[in-house]
Structures are given as structure tokens and as C-alpha cells.
UniProtKB/Swiss-Prot annotation:
GO (cellular component) term, any one: cytosol
Family: Belongs to the methyltransferase superfamily. RNA methyltransferase RsmG family.
Keywords annotated in UniProt: Cytoplasm, Methyltransferase, rRNA processing, S-adenosyl-L-methionine, Transferase
Top-level EC class as recorded in UniProt: transferase
Location of this chain's protein in the cell: Cytoplasm
Record's keyword annotation contains S-adenosyl-L-methionine: yes
Protein name as it appears in the record: Ribosomal RNA small subunit methyltransferase G
Top-level lineage group: Bacteria
One Gene Ontology term of the molecular function aspect: rRNA (guanine-N7-)-methyltransferase activity
InterPro entries: rRNA_ssu_MeTfrase_G, SAM-dependent_MTases_sf
Protein EC: 2.1.1.-
HAMAP family in alphabetical order: 16SrRNA_methyltr_G
């Protein structure tokens, strides 16, 4: 991790590092009973899951904002974001009850008062959010439709923050997804940020990117 061009770990406080380590321990413990992540990826959790999610912290989330994580699964990226942004509210939405309950318990054990879960379909959540995030959950057009339904603008986003909207962790050929998104909403603005460029490494992150969508 020390050879990364940019590393989210360097800016973490000692308390946040401890919370990250405890999150890994708790998630792997729950994973023995609930399928939160693939067992084959447990040994590479720090890279394949944690670092992947923390690339979203390359830019800021304003204090007081609400972030909704569609299909949070094992709390990825909801819990890492809640750890790194204690002044933001993070809501993990998942339709699988046992996953939602596991994430709720993990967040409570980590002392994350800013992290919540909601069990149900994404298109039925009735809250409001300034940002939506997602990791391997649904096509961009669906994610954007879910975000637009609940979107509100931050009061005063700072210049270092992500523009309000959708931030999706994606990989592979996205041409069809982007085309479908623009067919559904021709005015949607899409920015694509290569994780390989951000992190300065090949391998797992070679074709992965953050897709930022905003109005």
C-alpha cells in the first residue's frame, strides 16, 4: 500500500485506522454466517474491498451531507465512508434483511453514530440524499433514477467536494451502460475517473473507475 501514487490510508487518524481494522474483523466474522463478501476475497480484503471503496474519498463529502449506498451488502462502501467522514450521514440500503442487520450491528459495534441501514428495495426508500454511491449493484441508468428520486442539493458544497450526484464504482466496458443512461436522461453529465490513474497501479484496478453522474 505504501507505493500507491495516492493513498487514502495516509490521511486516516489513529482512531479511524483502528475502526477500519475492527471493521475488517467484524465483517469476516459475520461472513462465516452471512454471505457479505465472497469467501475467496477474504485474504485480499484490504485491496479488493477496502481500498476500492476508499477511492471515493479522493474528494471530500461536505459536513452535514447525507450519502445513500444502494445495495450496501457488507457495508461497502457505507461503513468505510462513515468512518472517514464522521460529519456526514451514511445510509446503507439493501433488500436482504440479514445483510442489513449484520451491517447495523457492525456499525453499532464500531461506534458509528452516523451510519444507518434500511432494509428494502432501493426504489422504495423514502429518505433524501445529497449523494448516492454504489459498488457492483445495478446499471448506471437504474442508479441514476434512484438518485434523482431522492436527491437534494447541499447547502454549501466546498470546492474540494464531489459535485452532488451519483458516484458509482464500476469496471469493464461501460459504453452500453453510459448510452442507456443518456437515453433515459440526455441531460445527465458523466465524468469517469480511472482508479489506475488515481492509485498508480495495475492488476485489480486496471479497468476500474469512479463514474460520477450529476444533473
Amino acid at each position: 500500500m505504501e507505493n500507491l501514487a495516492w493513498s487514502p490510508f495516509k490521511s486516516l487518524t489513529a482512531e479511524q485506522r483502528e475502526q477500519i481494522d475492527r471493521f475488517r474483523e467484524q465483517l469476516l466474522r459475520f461472513n462465516q454466517r452471512v454471505n457479505l463478501i465472497s469467501p475467496e476475497t477474504e485474504d485480499t480484503f484490504r485491496t479488493r474491498h477496502l481500498l476500492h471503496c476508499l477511492t471515493l474519498t479522493a474528494r471530500d463529502f461536505p459536513a452535514g451531507c447525507t450519502v445513500v449506498d444502494w445495495g450496501t451488502g457488507g457495508g461497502l462502501p457505507a461503513i468505510p465512508l462513515a468512518i472517514c467522514h464522521p460529519e456526514a450521514t451514511v445510509v446503507g440500503v439493501d433488500s436482504v434483511g440479514k445483510k442489513s442487520r449484520a451491517v447495523r450491528t457492525i456499525a453499532r459495534r464500531l461506534g458509528l453514530d452516523n451510519c444507518f441501514t434500511w432494509n428494502g428495495r432501493a426504489d422504495e426508500w423514502t429518505g433524501e440524499a445529497h449523494y448516492s454511491v454504489s459498488r457492483a449493484t445495478a446499471p448506471l441508468a437504474d442508479l441514476w433514477a434512484w438518485h434523482r428520486r431522492v436527491a437534494v442539493s447541499p447547502d454549501d458544497p466546498n470546492g474540494d467536494a464531489w459535485p452532488p450526484g451519483l458516484l458509482a464504482l464500476k469496471g469493464g466496458d461501460l459504453s452500453d451502460e453510459v448510452a442507456a443512461l443518456h437515453a433515459a436522461d440526455p441531460d445527465a453529465r458523466v465524468e469517469r475517473h480511472s482508479l489506475n490513474d488515481l492509485l498508480g497501479r495495475n492488476g485489480f484496478f486496471g479497468e476500474k473507475e469512479i463514474v460520477a453522474v450529476r444533473s
